[in-house]
């Protein structure tokens, strides 16, 4: 395939991703009246189609002023999100990376059963485990604390499933050579597995961050004190 065709395909894909981001950015500079006018056919069931201009007709900084200056609780909720999400992502890597390495590089009894259990737990939606998680966290005295969000998130099985593929792709010749040079299992993991598995680790970090930064059900269920709420629960209320 010629280079110009590849460039056109990549440009089209980039445009497909860029357009929604640009729409969000332009909407942030629109006043409420202009936004309602653009979406009137959808909001009021009028005849016609909603339209979205490339640039706001009457740009304004009012939404930013209202959010950043007139709503000081925004910064509290932002800090709450950081306190919850960053420990979760760090815990997922600290716990998940060694587990993924073990699944990818070692043979042990019960490996298939344990891996199947990981897959089953990964496929279970939060609604299935919500009641049991509630009772466990309540018995541990963690309800209405940030740990009620951090601990279940840090032991998520999805990062393990994701990183296994990247660790398994590392050539066995490299680990065998390191073993012959006298490196132990832990040294091989630290000095060989982690550097070569960076793409998988970064993928797990990005997906884990997005998942828990936008989480709604977990904080809504486990956090009754609104001062502990993250941005994902606070922002939907700002337009009221």
Residue ranges, per PLM feature:
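A structural signal for multi-pass alpha-helical bundles of membrane permease subunits
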Residues: 2-240
């Amino acid at each position: 395939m010629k280079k110009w065709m590849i460039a056109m395909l990549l440009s089209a894909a980039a445009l497909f991703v860029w357009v929604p981001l640009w729409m969000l950015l332009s909407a942030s500079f629109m006043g409420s009246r202009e936004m309602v006018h653009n979406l009137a056919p959808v909001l009021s069931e009028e005849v016609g189609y909603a339209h979205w201009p490339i640039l706001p007709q009457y740009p304004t900084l009012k939404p930013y002023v209202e959010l950043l200056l007139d709503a000081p609780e925004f910064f509290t909720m932002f800090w709450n999100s950081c306190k919850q999400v960053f420990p979760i992502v760090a815990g997922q890597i600290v716990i998940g990376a060694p587990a993924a390495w073990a699944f990818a590089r070692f043979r042990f009894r019960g490996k298939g059963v344990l891996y199947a259990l990981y897959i089953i737990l990964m496929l279970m939606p939060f609604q299935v485990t919500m009641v049991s998680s509630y009772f466990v966290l309540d018995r541990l005295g963690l309800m209405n604390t940030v740990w009620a969000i951090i601990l279940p998130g840090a032991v998520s099985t999805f990062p393990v499933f994701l990183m296994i593929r990247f660790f398994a792709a590392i050539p066995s010749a490299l680990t065998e050579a390191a073993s012959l040079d006298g490196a132990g299992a832990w040294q091989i993991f630290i000095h060989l597995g982690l550097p070569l598995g960076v793409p998988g680790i970064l993928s797990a970090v990005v997906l884990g961050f997005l998942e828990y930064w936008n989480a709604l059900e977990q904080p809504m269920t486990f956090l009754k004190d609104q001062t502990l709420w993250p941005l994902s629960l606070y922002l939907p209320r700002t337009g009221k």
